[in-house]
């Protein structure tokens, strides 16, 4: 009983912070909604351009799920046929800090036979006109 009292004493002496302000609102809200500067975005785009399109380092950048569907619908294999797109899943964090979708693409007997294309759907107002290596984009 004495040991339990000694062990419980420090815990009982601590005041819970429940309901107490931990930081002024100005500090808590600082940085929210600021986004990236144009210079930062330009640096990120320049760095991404050093990598193949459709990778985590240079994902296909589209505006939302609609942009993703539109891009994949335009994707063509080397023989001009439409690529078959499998079930998409999270593919990891891309160079822009977003979770990229991984879209498995199959061209059957045409080149490239199979590829995993990474797509960043968080690039509002962006329409990429480049295709990953071995693919083409159909005109709009």
Where are these regions (language model features)?
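Sec-dependent N-terminal signal peptides
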Residues: 1-5
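N-terminal signal peptide c-region/cleavage motif recognized by signal peptidases
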Residues: 8-10
């Amino acid at each position: 009983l004495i040991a339990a009292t000694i062990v419980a004493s420090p815990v009982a002496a601590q005041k819970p912070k429940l309901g107490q302000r931990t930081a002024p609102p100005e500090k808590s809200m600082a940085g929210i909604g600021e986004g990236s500067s144009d210079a930062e975005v330009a640096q990120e785009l320049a760095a991404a351009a050093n990598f193949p399109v459709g990778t985590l380092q240079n994902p296909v950048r589209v505006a939302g799920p609609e942009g993703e569907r539109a891009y994949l619908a335009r994707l063509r294999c080397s023989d001009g046929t439409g690529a078959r797109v499998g079930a998409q899943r999270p593919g990891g964090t891309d160079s822009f800090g977003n979770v990229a979708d991984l879209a498995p693409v199959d061209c059957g007997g045409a080149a490239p036979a199979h590829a995993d294309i990474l797509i960043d759907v968080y690039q509002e107002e962006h329409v990429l006109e480049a295709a990953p290596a071995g693919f083409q984009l159909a005109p709009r």
